[in-house]
Amino acid sequence: ETFDVLVIGGGITGVGVALDAASRGLRTALVERDDFASGTSSKSSKLVHGGLRYLQQGEVNLVYQALHERQRLRRNAPHLVKVLPFMIPVLTKDGVVSRKVARALGSAMWMYDLTGGWRIGRFHRRLRKQQAFTHLPTMPAERLASAYLYYDARVDDARLVLTVARTAAAHGAAVVNRATVTAITKSPDGTVQGAVVEADGRRIDVRARCIVNAAGVWADDIRAMDEGRHPDSIRPAKGVHITVPWEKVRNDIAVVIPVPKDKRSLFVVPWGPKPDGTFRFTFVGTTDTDYDGPLDDPQCTKADIDRSEEHTSEL
Protein backbone atom coordinates (compact mmCIF):
# COMPACT_ATOMS: atom_id res chain seq x y z
CA GLU A 1 0.00 0.00 0.00
CA THR A 2 1.15 3.53 -0.79
CA PHE A 3 0.05 6.12 1.75
CA ASP A 4 -0.84 9.68 0.92
CA VAL A 5 0.74 10.92 4.15
CA LEU A 6 3.36 9.42 6.47
CA VAL A 7 3.65 11.23 9.81
CA ILE A 8 6.86 10.77 11.81
CA GLY A 9 6.32 11.41 15.52
CA GLY A 10 3.64 10.35 17.99
CA GLY A 11 3.30 13.44 20.15
CA ILE A 12 0.30 15.75 20.10
CA THR A 13 1.45 17.44 16.88
CA GLY A 14 1.94 14.16 15.04
CA VAL A 15 -1.31 12.54 16.12
CA GLY A 16 -3.15 15.78 15.40
CA VAL A 17 -1.79 15.84 11.85
CA ALA A 18 -2.69 12.16 11.41
CA LEU A 19 -6.26 12.76 12.57
CA ASP A 20 -6.64 15.79 10.32
CA ALA A 21 -5.35 13.89 7.29
CA ALA A 22 -7.31 10.69 7.95
CA SER A 23 -10.55 12.56 8.60
CA ARG A 24 -10.18 14.20 5.17
CA GLY A 25 -10.02 10.82 3.47
CA LEU A 26 -6.26 10.65 2.97
CA ARG A 27 -4.53 7.30 3.40
CA THR A 28 -2.46 8.04 6.47
CA ALA A 29 0.25 6.29 8.47
CA LEU A 30 1.98 7.42 11.65
CA VAL A 31 5.12 5.94 13.21
CA GLU A 32 6.56 6.70 16.64
CA ARG A 33 9.97 5.34 17.65
CA ASP A 34 9.12 5.15 21.36
CA ASP A 35 5.67 5.30 22.96
CA PHE A 36 2.96 7.81 22.19
CA ALA A 37 3.43 11.08 24.10
CA SER A 38 6.79 9.89 25.45
CA GLY A 39 8.47 13.23 24.70
CA THR A 40 7.31 16.74 25.45
CA SER A 41 3.65 15.77 25.15
CA SER A 42 3.65 13.98 28.51
CA LYS A 43 5.85 16.52 30.30
CA SER A 44 3.80 19.68 30.02
CA SER A 45 2.22 21.85 32.71
CA LYS A 46 -1.07 19.96 32.06
CA LEU A 47 -2.72 23.24 31.10
CA VAL A 48 -4.87 24.33 28.18
CA HIS A 49 -4.53 28.07 28.44
CA GLY A 50 -4.81 31.06 26.17
CA GLY A 51 -1.40 32.46 27.02
CA LEU A 52 -2.22 35.36 29.30
CA ARG A 53 1.47 36.21 29.46
CA TYR A 54 1.57 36.76 25.69
CA LEU A 55 -0.62 39.81 26.19
CA GLN A 56 2.39 41.33 27.96
CA GLN A 57 4.26 40.93 24.68
CA GLY A 58 1.48 42.36 22.51
CA GLU A 59 0.61 39.00 20.92
CA VAL A 60 -3.14 39.62 20.90
CA ASN A 61 -3.83 37.54 17.79
CA LEU A 62 -1.93 34.58 19.26
CA VAL A 63 -4.00 34.76 22.45
CA TYR A 64 -7.22 34.96 20.41
CA GLN A 65 -6.28 31.82 18.47
CA ALA A 66 -5.21 29.95 21.62
CA LEU A 67 -8.48 30.76 23.40
CA HIS A 68 -10.45 29.65 20.35
CA GLU A 69 -8.59 26.32 20.34
CA ARG A 70 -9.09 25.97 24.09
CA GLN A 71 -12.83 26.10 23.53
CA ARG A 72 -12.58 23.60 20.69
CA LEU A 73 -10.75 21.16 22.96
CA ARG A 74 -13.33 21.60 25.72
CA ARG A 75 -16.07 20.81 23.24
CA ASN A 76 -14.32 17.83 21.64
CA ALA A 77 -12.86 16.25 24.80
CA PRO A 78 -14.94 17.34 27.82
CA HIS A 79 -13.91 14.19 29.70
CA LEU A 80 -10.26 15.30 29.55
CA VAL A 81 -10.31 19.10 29.47
CA LYS A 82 -11.71 20.68 32.65
CA VAL A 83 -12.14 24.29 33.78
CA LEU A 84 -9.45 25.38 36.26
CA PRO A 85 -9.58 28.65 38.24
CA PHE A 86 -6.38 30.71 38.32
CA MET A 87 -5.42 33.34 40.87
CA ILE A 88 -2.91 36.17 40.37
CA PRO A 89 -1.95 37.62 43.77
CA VAL A 90 -1.57 41.38 44.13
CA LEU A 91 1.39 41.71 46.48
CA THR A 92 2.52 44.51 48.74
CA LYS A 93 6.04 45.86 48.99
CA ASP A 94 6.85 47.14 52.47
CA GLY A 95 3.11 47.18 53.13
CA VAL A 96 2.26 49.26 50.03
CA VAL A 97 0.35 48.06 46.98
CA SER A 98 1.57 49.38 43.63
CA ARG A 99 -1.51 50.97 42.06
CA LYS A 100 0.22 50.81 38.68
CA VAL A 101 0.64 47.04 38.95
CA ALA A 102 -2.94 46.55 40.16
CA ARG A 103 -4.35 48.63 37.28
CA ALA A 104 -2.17 46.79 34.76
CA LEU A 105 -3.41 43.43 36.04
CA GLY A 106 -7.02 44.57 35.86
CA SER A 107 -6.57 45.78 32.29
CA ALA A 108 -4.91 42.50 31.31
CA MET A 109 -7.81 40.54 32.81
CA TRP A 110 -10.38 42.50 30.79
CA MET A 111 -8.35 42.14 27.61
CA TYR A 112 -8.07 38.38 28.20
CA ASP A 113 -11.83 38.05 28.71
CA LEU A 114 -12.66 40.15 25.65
CA THR A 115 -10.08 38.38 23.47
CA GLY A 116 -11.89 35.10 24.03
CA GLY A 117 -11.65 34.14 27.69
CA TRP A 118 -15.40 34.71 28.02
CA ARG A 119 -16.02 31.57 25.96
CA ILE A 120 -15.37 29.47 29.07
CA GLY A 121 -18.59 30.92 30.49
CA ARG A 122 -17.10 32.99 33.31
CA PHE A 123 -15.48 36.41 33.63
CA HIS A 124 -12.59 37.36 35.88
CA ARG A 125 -13.22 39.02 39.23
CA ARG A 126 -11.29 40.74 41.99
CA LEU A 127 -10.80 38.94 45.31
CA ARG A 128 -10.40 40.58 48.68
CA LYS A 129 -7.36 39.68 50.76
CA GLN A 130 -9.15 37.12 52.93
CA GLN A 131 -10.82 35.47 49.93
CA ALA A 132 -7.47 35.16 48.20
CA PHE A 133 -5.78 33.83 51.33
CA THR A 134 -8.20 30.88 51.54
CA HIS A 135 -6.92 29.68 48.15
CA LEU A 136 -3.25 29.84 49.20
CA PRO A 137 -3.13 29.65 53.02
CA THR A 138 0.62 29.04 53.19
CA MET A 139 1.40 32.47 51.77
CA PRO A 140 2.57 35.17 54.24
CA ALA A 141 -0.61 37.13 54.91
CA GLU A 142 1.24 40.43 55.24
CA ARG A 143 2.41 40.20 51.60
CA LEU A 144 -1.05 39.64 50.16
CA ALA A 145 -3.22 42.66 49.37
CA SER A 146 -5.83 41.15 47.04
CA ALA A 147 -5.93 39.00 43.91
CA TYR A 148 -7.54 38.50 40.53
CA LEU A 149 -9.39 35.29 39.70
CA TYR A 150 -9.80 34.11 36.11
CA TYR A 151 -10.41 30.81 34.35
CA ASP A 152 -8.52 28.52 31.99
CA ALA A 153 -8.41 24.73 31.71
CA ARG A 154 -6.36 21.68 32.63
CA VAL A 155 -5.84 18.41 30.79
CA ASP A 156 -4.21 15.02 31.20
CA ASP A 157 -1.75 15.62 28.36
CA ALA A 158 -0.74 11.99 27.70
CA ARG A 159 -4.36 10.79 27.69
CA LEU A 160 -5.23 13.52 25.21
CA VAL A 161 -2.51 12.28 22.86
CA LEU A 162 -3.71 8.68 23.13
CA THR A 163 -7.31 9.75 22.54
CA VAL A 164 -6.39 11.68 19.39
CA ALA A 165 -4.27 8.74 18.16
CA ARG A 166 -7.17 6.32 18.67
CA THR A 167 -9.53 8.70 16.88
CA ALA A 168 -7.11 8.90 13.94
CA ALA A 169 -7.02 5.10 13.83
CA ALA A 170 -10.83 5.01 13.89
CA HIS A 171 -10.75 7.19 10.76
CA GLY A 172 -8.53 4.62 9.04
CA ALA A 173 -5.01 5.78 9.89
CA ALA A 174 -2.33 3.14 10.48
CA VAL A 175 -0.86 4.22 13.83
CA VAL A 176 2.21 2.35 15.13
CA ASN A 177 4.58 2.92 18.03
CA ARG A 178 7.99 1.32 18.72
CA ALA A 179 8.75 1.87 15.03
CA THR A 180 11.92 3.81 14.19
CA VAL A 181 12.55 5.61 10.91
CA THR A 182 16.09 4.83 9.77
CA ALA A 183 16.10 6.33 6.28
CA ILE A 184 14.10 8.47 3.87
CA THR A 185 13.67 6.86 0.46
CA LYS A 186 13.68 8.83 -2.80
CA SER A 187 13.15 8.25 -6.50
CA PRO A 188 16.05 8.77 -8.95
CA ASP A 189 14.92 12.38 -9.51
CA GLY A 190 15.08 13.11 -5.77
CA THR A 191 11.36 12.97 -5.02
CA VAL A 192 10.55 11.56 -1.58
CA GLN A 193 8.91 8.15 -1.86
CA GLY A 194 8.63 7.09 1.76
CA ALA A 195 10.78 5.84 4.61
CA VAL A 196 12.52 2.76 5.94
CA VAL A 197 11.09 1.76 9.32
CA GLU A 198 12.44 -0.78 11.80
CA ALA A 199 9.93 -2.45 14.11
CA ASP A 200 10.06 -5.76 16.00
CA GLY A 201 13.42 -6.53 14.40
CA ARG A 202 11.99 -6.16 10.90
CA ARG A 203 12.88 -3.67 8.18
CA ILE A 204 9.79 -2.25 6.48
CA ASP A 205 9.67 -0.01 3.42
CA VAL A 206 6.77 2.39 3.87
CA ARG A 207 5.80 4.17 0.67
CA ALA A 208 4.20 7.60 0.92
CA ARG A 209 3.59 10.55 -1.35
CA CYS A 210 4.18 13.02 1.47
CA ILE A 211 6.10 12.92 4.76
CA VAL A 212 5.30 15.16 7.72
CA ASN A 213 8.17 15.57 10.16
CA ALA A 214 6.53 15.91 13.59
CA ALA A 215 9.45 14.54 15.60
CA GLY A 216 9.68 17.49 17.99
CA VAL A 217 13.19 18.17 19.28
CA TRP A 218 14.40 15.25 17.15
CA ALA A 219 13.12 16.86 13.93
CA ASP A 220 16.66 17.72 12.80
CA ASP A 221 17.58 14.02 12.91
CA ILE A 222 14.84 13.30 10.38
CA ARG A 223 15.89 16.26 8.26
CA ALA A 224 19.46 14.97 8.25
CA MET A 225 18.22 11.70 6.70
CA ASP A 226 16.58 13.72 3.95
CA GLU A 227 19.22 16.40 3.35
CA GLY A 228 22.35 14.36 4.03
CA ARG A 229 23.63 16.75 6.70
CA HIS A 230 22.47 17.91 10.10
CA PRO A 231 20.74 21.27 9.69
CA ASP A 232 20.95 22.38 13.35
CA SER A 233 17.73 24.34 12.96
CA ILE A 234 16.19 23.21 16.24
CA ARG A 235 17.18 25.17 19.34
CA PRO A 236 16.24 22.90 22.25
CA ALA A 237 14.89 24.53 25.38
CA LYS A 238 14.29 22.94 28.75
CA GLY A 239 11.30 23.72 30.90
CA VAL A 240 11.47 22.24 34.41
CA HIS A 241 8.62 21.66 36.84
CA ILE A 242 9.28 20.83 40.46
CA THR A 243 6.74 18.56 42.13
CA VAL A 244 6.08 19.05 45.83
CA PRO A 245 3.63 17.40 48.23
CA TRP A 246 0.38 19.34 48.11
CA GLU A 247 0.41 19.76 51.91
CA LYS A 248 3.44 22.05 51.56
CA VAL A 249 1.42 24.58 49.52
CA ARG A 250 -2.26 23.73 50.06
CA ASN A 251 -3.52 25.71 47.05
CA ASP A 252 -6.97 24.57 45.94
CA ILE A 253 -6.70 26.42 42.60
CA ALA A 254 -3.84 27.34 40.27
CA VAL A 255 -1.75 30.37 41.19
CA VAL A 256 0.18 32.53 38.71
CA ILE A 257 3.42 34.15 39.82
CA PRO A 258 4.59 36.90 37.43
CA VAL A 259 8.35 37.01 36.75
CA PRO A 260 8.72 40.62 35.56
CA LYS A 261 12.37 40.53 34.52
CA ASP A 262 11.71 37.54 32.23
CA LYS A 263 8.30 38.77 30.99
CA ARG A 264 6.86 35.39 31.85
CA SER A 265 5.03 33.62 34.66
CA LEU A 266 5.36 30.57 36.85
CA PHE A 267 2.34 28.36 37.48
CA VAL A 268 1.63 26.71 40.83
CA VAL A 269 -0.86 24.00 39.88
CA PRO A 270 -2.57 21.43 42.16
CA TRP A 271 -2.71 17.96 40.64
CA GLY A 272 -4.13 14.57 41.52
CA PRO A 273 -7.47 15.35 43.19
CA LYS A 274 -8.57 13.26 46.17
CA PRO A 275 -12.16 12.45 47.22
CA ASP A 276 -11.90 14.85 50.18
CA GLY A 277 -11.21 17.84 47.91
CA THR A 278 -7.46 17.98 48.53
CA PHE A 279 -4.72 17.02 46.08
CA ARG A 280 -1.69 14.75 45.95
CA PHE A 281 0.85 17.14 44.42
CA THR A 282 1.53 20.70 43.38
CA PHE A 283 3.48 21.41 40.19
CA VAL A 284 5.62 24.55 40.14
CA GLY A 285 6.98 25.71 36.80
CA THR A 286 8.07 26.04 34.26
CA THR A 287 11.56 27.41 33.74
CA ASP A 288 12.69 28.19 30.21
CA THR A 289 16.39 27.79 29.44
CA ASP A 290 18.50 26.71 26.49
CA TYR A 291 19.52 23.06 26.57
CA ASP A 292 22.49 21.32 24.94
CA GLY A 293 22.43 17.95 26.71
CA PRO A 294 21.18 14.54 25.53
CA LEU A 295 17.70 14.88 24.08
CA ASP A 296 16.61 11.37 24.99
CA ASP A 297 17.19 11.82 28.71
CA PRO A 298 17.08 15.46 29.86
CA GLN A 299 17.92 15.92 33.50
CA CYS A 300 16.81 18.45 36.09
CA THR A 301 19.79 20.19 37.70
CA LYS A 302 20.19 21.94 41.04
CA ALA A 303 20.33 25.25 39.15
CA ASP A 304 16.90 24.50 37.65
CA ILE A 305 15.44 23.85 41.09
CA ASP A 306 17.10 26.93 42.56
CA ARG A 307 15.66 29.06 39.77
CA SER A 308 12.13 27.87 40.50
CA GLU A 309 12.56 28.31 44.25
CA GLU A 310 13.92 31.82 43.74
CA HIS A 311 10.70 32.96 42.10
CA THR A 312 8.39 31.17 44.55
CA SER A 313 10.24 31.87 47.81
CA GLU A 314 8.13 34.91 48.66
CA LEU A 315 4.99 32.78 48.43
What are these regions (language model features)?
Residues F3, G201-C210:
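Core beta-strand elements of the Rossmann-like FAD/NAD(P) dinucleotide-binding domain
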Residues E1-T13:
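Beta1/beta-strand and adjacent pyrophosphate-binding region of the FAD-binding site
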Residues A18, A22, A169:
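Gly/Ala-rich phosphate-binding loop of Rossmann-like dinucleotide-binding domains
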Residues F133-H171, G194-V196, V206, T287-D296:
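Helix-loop-beta segment of a Rossmann-like dinucleotide-binding subdomain
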Residues N177-Q193:
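A conserved short coil-to-beta-strand element within the FAD-binding core of flavoproteins
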Residues K46-H135, S265-L266:
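Dinucleotide-binding Rossmann-like beta1-alpha1 core, especially the glycine-rich loop
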Residues A22-S42:
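Glycine-rich FAD pyrophosphate-binding loop
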Residues V31, H79-P85, V181, D205-V206, ...:
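Active-site substrate-recognition segment that forms the wall
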